[in-house]
C-alpha cells in the first residue's frame, strides 16, 4: 500500500503513477483527495516481490522529485476481511461541535463495527448560517450484530 501526502499541484498524480509504472508496479485500487491544499494518495500497488522492493528502495527518489511524504506498507489481499460482516451506509448532520467524529467512532468501536470509509464536511445552514457538520460513512457491521431496521 503506497500512501503519500503533499502540497497539491497539477501533475502530482501523473508523477506518482509514473514512478510506480516505471518500476513495474500496477495500481489496483486508489483513493485520492485534495483537502485544504494538501493532496492525499492511497494506492494498492501490485507487483512481484522484486518490484515492490524496487519501489520501496526508490521512495527517496519519489520524495525528492515530488516533495511529498510517501511510504510503502504491506496490505491484506483484496477482499480480505477479518470477520463476516455486512456493509451499511451511515449518514448524519448536526450542528457542529468539537468531538463529533470521536463520539461516533467510539460508539462504532464499542459495537465492534469497522469504518470502511468516512467523509466529513462542514457546511453552512441555509437560513441561519450556523455551521452544520455532515458525515457519510460506509461501515462493516459484524453479521452476528442485530441491526434495527425502520
Describe each model-derived feature in a short phrase.
Residues 1-150:
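A conserved regulatory-domain signal marking ACT and ACT-like small-molecule sensing domains
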Amino acid at each position: 500500500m503506497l500512501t503519500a501526502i503533499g502540497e497539491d499541484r497539477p501533475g502530482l498524480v501523473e508523477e506518482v503513477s509514473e514512478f510506480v509504472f516505471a518500476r513495474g508496479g500496477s495500481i489496483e485500487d486508489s483513493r485520492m483527495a485534495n483537502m485544504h491544499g494538501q493532496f492525499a494518495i492511497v494506492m494498492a500497488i501490485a507487483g512481484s516481490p522484486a518490484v515492490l522492493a524496487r519501489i520501496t528502495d526508490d521512495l527517496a527518489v519519489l520524495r525528492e522529485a515530488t516533495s511529498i511524504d510517501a511510504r510503502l506498507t504491506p496490505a491484506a489481499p483484496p477482499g480480505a476481511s477479518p470477520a463476516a460482516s455486512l456493509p451499511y451506509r451511515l449518514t448524519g448532520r448536526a450542528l457542529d461541535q468539537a468531538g463529533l467524529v470521536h463520539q461516533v467512532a467510539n460508539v462504532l468501536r464499542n459495537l465492534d463495527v469497522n469504518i470502511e470509509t468516512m467523509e466529513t464536511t462542514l457546511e453552512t445552514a441555509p437560513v441561519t448560517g450556523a455551521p452544520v457538520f455532515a458525515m457519510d460513512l460506509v461501515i462493516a457491521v459484524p453479521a452476528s450484530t442485530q441491526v434495527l431496521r425502520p
